[in-house]
């Protein structure tokens, strides 16, 4: 559990500090180009889910986040053998859930600020996201890898 907190808390702090920086220095919907035609910092409110889908459902996503937080905490305090990949996944997920939940409670929306132009058809630019979103996405990838490893070792 201590290991997970040592991972989660700095990532949560990084998420909140970067969002505070954006809110103080970048006006709503403004873009600050960092690398021309590739990367900008923006200030985009998101009341929906990933990629801005299901907009206008902040209360619903607060409830979902609280439930997800409770499930992750249950999984963390349950006695089970150590598993590094699973524990890293849970730590990343915890940081991401808390980061976006904090935004929803404080601001009424999630603060998205990283905008990449990957020159990919139908995603040009890629939708804005934040550190918490990155933590959640990486956690999902790690969970998938973990489940395949478990299936392979069982079979």
Give the ranges of each region predicted by the language model.
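Alpha-helical transmembrane bundles and membrane-interface segments of multipass inner-membrane proteins
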Residues: 1-155
């Amino acid at each position: 559990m201590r290991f997970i907190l040592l991972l989660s808390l700095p990532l949560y702090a990084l998420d909140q500090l970067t969002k505070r920086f954006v809110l103080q220095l970048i006006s709503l919907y403004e873009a600050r180009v960092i690398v021309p035609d590739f990367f900008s910092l923006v200030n985009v409110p998101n009341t929906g889910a990933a990629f801005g889908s299901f907009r206008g459902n902040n209360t619903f996503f607060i409830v979902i986040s609280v439930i997800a937080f409770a499930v992750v905490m249950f999984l963390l305090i349950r006695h089970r053998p150590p598993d590094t990949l699973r524990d890293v996944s849970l730590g990343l997920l915890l940081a991401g859930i808390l980061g976006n939940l904090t935004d929803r409670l404080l601001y009424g929306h999630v603060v998205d600020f990283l905008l990449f132009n990957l020159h990919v058809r139908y995603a040009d630019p890629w939708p804005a996201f934040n550190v918490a979103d990155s933590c959640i996405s990486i956690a999902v990838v790690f969970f998938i890898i973990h489940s395949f490893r478990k299936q392979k070792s069982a079979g």
